Amino acid sequence: MGVNVSTLEELINKWQDILRLRDWDIKLKIVETEWRKSGDIKIDMDDKKAVMLINNNPKSTNLEELVVHELLHLKLWGMDQMLEGFINQIFGEGEGDIKKEFAMNQFFILLESTVEDLTKGLLKANGCEKELSFGRLQKLIDSEIGC
């Protein structure tokens, strides 16, 4: 099947304006190999460059939702890195500390749920009528009922 690159580029351009990210250089890269994610974003804060990775066979059915989600990670990157650094200052850089693992897990859960809530709200406020993607939840349902 594959994703439509020009549609994705239009969505990135549209949402760069809405999210006030016009000062960033954002490149789109389609991931052709098997990949567990629908999307990701790699960020160079010093140079204000980012590469948005989109799975050519995404689990997400709403590409606009996927683009907004990844761009919000870019928008929140500074705060994300500050909080990760804070957790590392408290618990150290080493692995295996259950308190640090707990703090990091809670932080990432809160970050993802916040990004998801902001994504849904922004899509609705900007008139996106396409149904939200239930890809991750659908996978759980399929494994539960044997589809």
Region locations from a protein language model:
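Metalloprotease/metallohydrolase-associated module, dominated by Zn2+-dependent proteases
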Residues: 2-61, 78-147
